[in-house]
Design a protein with these regions (language model features):
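Rossmann-fold NAD(P)-binding glycine/threonine-rich loop
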Residues: 47, 53-54, 67-89, 95-107
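A general structural motif
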Residues: 1, 36-37, 60, 84, ...
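Glycine- and other small-residue-rich loops at beta-strand/loop junctions that grip anionic moieties
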Residues: 41, 66-68, 92, 127, ...
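Rossmann-like NAD(P)-binding element
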Residues: 34-51, 57, 61-64
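Short, conserved beta-strand edge motifs with alternating hydrophobic and charged residues
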Residues: 66, 90, 118-122
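C-terminal substrate-binding/catalytic lobe of Rossmann-fold NAD(P)-dependent oxidoreductases
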Residues: 3-34, 113-159
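Electropositive phosphate-/nucleotide-binding environments in soluble metabolic enzymes
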Residues: 7, 11, 15, 43-46, ...
Length: 159
């Protein structure tokens, strides 16, 4: 049985994940002693992520980070910790976004024209971070894939 600790279990994604874990006969939700977990999933607030990285590093626990809006210092800490523990950092874990990213990479690599990009997103009224981590991740993907400098600008419109 895989033991999972969910950091940020009271948020939208955390609640969804804990419900799925509780329904599974192959997964066990760890709620108190994080050191007993086989993996930690972080859907918390950016302020909490740094501490969970340190705890996972100290206890040699693999970490999945779905928290967005992380600062530069946290990204540096993630890179350091990834030398000692497995870390998956993903702003959006949906299959649809994965397929979108793959399509964007294929398009950017094959494109020969100069283009401008607009990433437009609409959210529910309770959305905490704007632009979303997904939009920022897509912008970074385009920028890092554009080896021929065909993308003039990339804008994000978030409502």
């Amino acid at each position: 049985m895989l033991k999972i600790y969910v950091n940020g279990s009271s948020g939208k994604m955390g609640l969804s994940l804990t419900n799925l874990i509780n329904q599974s006969q192959e997964l066990d939700l760890i709620t108190k002693d994080i050191s007993l977990s086989d993996v930690v999933v972080d859907f918390s607030h950016p302020d909490s992520t740094m501490e969970i990285i340190k705890i996972c590093s100290r206890n040699k626990i693999p970490l999945i980070i779905g928290t967005t809006n992380l600062n530069e210092e946290t990204h540096i800490e993630i890179k350091k910790a990834s030398k000692y523990i497995p870390i998956l950092l993903a702003a959006n874990m949906s299959i649809g976004i994965l397929q979108l990213k793959e399509s964007l990479v294929a398009f950017i690599r094959s494109n020969k024209e100069k283009i401008n990009c607009l990433i437009e997103e609409t959210h529910h009224s309770n959305k905490l971070d704007s632009p979303s981590g997904t939009a920022i991740e897509i912008k970074d993907l385009i920028k890092n894939t554009d080896k021929k400098s065909n993308v003039n600008q990339i804008k994000i419109s978030s409502k």
